[in-house]
């Protein structure tokens, strides 16, 4: 669909193929309570140690968020103190940060349906780049303006799981967030034209349990393709009035979890670990290939993890798929394990997912405990990547 004239996309901009993401959600949960998983997971306290742990296993690229709701408590007034600390420590530790400007949360006085949402967000984006470049004048800056617009528009617009707590407004929320997303890119590029954009959206598979029925097939395919509305708006294929451009669809991050494939009619999740595979389950390689065929852009597995006892098995499964993708010649630029450190549930902060490669057992000290099997799986994954000389 696209050529490579507008961006040096043939060059991988990431320091390491394996990446780690720190939970930074700061939204209002299903009960209307503000969550701060950056603080709840202890990342604020263990920031330096967390980076040291990742350096020890040669993960040098991470995802962090600025937490919009904490940066802008008064309209157009910004407190960058915590962001400055992350920038300084990451620079000192030689860690590359990919920045989320909005990771589910917005200031108390805003929702995506607020008439000033896009303006507030775009000014935030501009001021972030100005602040960042005042501290780091050189080098590449990679930004995700809004994480998972597709999921967030469903959660807040259709499922009443976060602000604006609506039903039947998913498209309106998505449209408004994409207006903000694009205006944010425009203002960031005014400050720094070299900025790279990594979109991060769920990669899903929706199928019918009645493939002999043409109407069921068409309905499942329609639902499946809705995952690409955000991408199509961003590159201007649909909703051109929002000023999307092909070059804005720069690096495509796909967030892929164990429950990302389901049956349209029943919403039953397709099992991922069966041998031989469930006949309706698509490999990650197949899903990634379909994204590349559609857009022709480099791809990153921008989030993946599994809770509980199967997390190491999941890492091995993802490693196998990534190696298969790389051997096929598709431009897979990286794989990010998210969360890299355990986190509590948004709606029940007493329940911990145990999905990171570092566990939190003592919820008072929030001390990190390595999950030995997950660490081993990561190290083996790294060996396979090195054997392919992806980062020779």
Language-model features, listed with the residues they occupy:
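Non-catalytic scaffold segments within catalytic domains of secreted glycoside hydrolases
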Residues: 2-45, 51, 55-57, 71-392
């Amino acid at each position: 669909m696209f050529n490579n004239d507008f961006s040096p996309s043939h060059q991988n901009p990431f320091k390491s193929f394996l990446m780690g993401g720190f939970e930074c959600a700061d939204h209002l949960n299903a009960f209307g309570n503000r969550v701060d998983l950056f603080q709840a997971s202890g990342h604020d306290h263990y920031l330096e140690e967390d980076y040291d742990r990742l350096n020890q296993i040669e993960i040098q690229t991470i995802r962090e968020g600025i937490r919009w709701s904490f940066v802008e408590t008064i309209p157009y007034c910004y407190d960058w103190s915590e962001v400055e600390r992350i920038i300084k420590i990451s620079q000192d530790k030689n860690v590359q940060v990919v920045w989320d400007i909005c990771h589910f949360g917005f200031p108390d006085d805003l929702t995506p349906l607020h008439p000033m949402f896009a303006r507030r967000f775009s000014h935030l984006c501009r001021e972030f780049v100005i602040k960042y470049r005042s501290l780091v004048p050189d080098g590449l800056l990679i930004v995700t303006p809004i994480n998972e617009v597709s999921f967030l528009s469903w959660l807040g617009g259709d499922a009443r799981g976060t602000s604006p707590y609506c039903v039947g407004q998913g498209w309106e929320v998505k449209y408004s967030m994409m207006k903000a997303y694009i205006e944010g890119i425009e203002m960031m590029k005014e400050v720094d034209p070299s900025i790279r954009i990594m979109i991060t959206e769920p990669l899903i598979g929706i199928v019918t349990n009645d493939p002999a029925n043409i109407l069921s097939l068409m309905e499942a395919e329609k639902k499946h393709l809705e995952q690409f509305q955000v991408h199509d708006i961003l590159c201007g294929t649909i909703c051109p009035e929002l000023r999307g451009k092909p070059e804005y669809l720069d690096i495509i991050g796909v967030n892929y979890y164990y429950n990302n494939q389901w049956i349209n009619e029943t919403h039953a999740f397709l099992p991922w670990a069966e041998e031989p595979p469930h006949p309706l389950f698509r490999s990650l390689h197949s899903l990634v290939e379909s994204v590349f065929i559609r857009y022709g852009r480099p791809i990153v597995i921008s989030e993946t993890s599994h809770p509980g006892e199967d997390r190491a098995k999941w890492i091995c499964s993802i490693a196998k798929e990534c190696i298969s993708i790389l051997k096929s010649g598709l431009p897979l630029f990286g794989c990010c394990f998210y969360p890299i450190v355990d986190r509590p549930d948004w709606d029940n902060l007493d329940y911990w997912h145990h999905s990171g490669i570092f566990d939190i057992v003592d919820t008072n000290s929030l001390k990190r405990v390595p999950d030995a099997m997950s660490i081993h799986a990561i190290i083996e994954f790294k060996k396979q990547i090195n054997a392919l000389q992806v980062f020779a």
